[in-house]
Amino acid sequence: MAPITFHLDVVSAEKRIFSGRVETFQVTGSEGELGIFHGHTPLLSAIKPGMVRIVKQHGHEEFIYVSGGMVEVQPGTATVLADTAIRGEDLDAAKAEEAKRRAEEKIQNQHGDMDFAQAASELAKAIAQLRVIELTKKRR
């Protein structure tokens, strides 16, 4: 028996990144990891920088980096509305490594709470991008 699917849209301010039927998807919500399957209770949550792991029909996976945003789950459909969303294969590993290095430098040379919070946020985003790149490469 085939798994039950539901519709998922992943959109950013610039464009729709993904639209289709999925078996499940995972995203990092404000309170931790969320695994969404068909029939999930309706939900609205903020999402943190990280990845959206999508399991499409027949078990095919796709990874998308999101810089934060919201996830909404309704009966039969879900939407990830991201500030920024980039497919794993479109991320630049060299740029992500450089962003990680710069953020680590800022943390080492901090001059107040605001500098630290900004640098920690930049570091989290760079690490999330590198993780999506790594998982996308493994999938191939």
UniProtKB/Swiss-Prot annotation:
Gene3D superfamilies: ATP synthase delta/epsilon subunit, C-terminal domain, F0F1 ATP synthase delta/epsilon subunit, N-terminal
Membrane topology: Peripheral membrane protein
Keywords recorded for this protein, A-Z: ATP synthesis, Cell inner membrane, Cell membrane, CF(1), Hydrogen ion transport, Ion transport, Membrane, Transport
InterPro entries: ATP_F1_dsu/esu_C_sf, ATP_synth_F1_dsu/esu, ATP_synth_F1_dsu/esu_N, ATP_synth_F1_esu_C, ATPsynth_dsu/esu_N
Pfam family, one: ATP-synt_DE
Gene Ontology cellular component terms for the protein in this record: plasma membrane; proton-transporting ATP synthase complex
Protein localization: Cell inner membrane
A molecular function (GO) term: ATP binding
Top-level taxon: Bacteria
Subunit structure, as described in the record: F-type ATPases have 2 components, CF(1) - the catalytic core - and CF(0) - the membrane proton channel. CF(1) has five subunits: alpha(3), beta(3), gamma(1), delta(1), epsilon(1). CF(0) has three main subunits: a, b and c.
Family: Belongs to the ATPase epsilon chain family.
Role this protein plays: Produces ATP from ADP in the presence of a proton gradient across the membrane.
This protein's name: ATP synthase epsilon chain
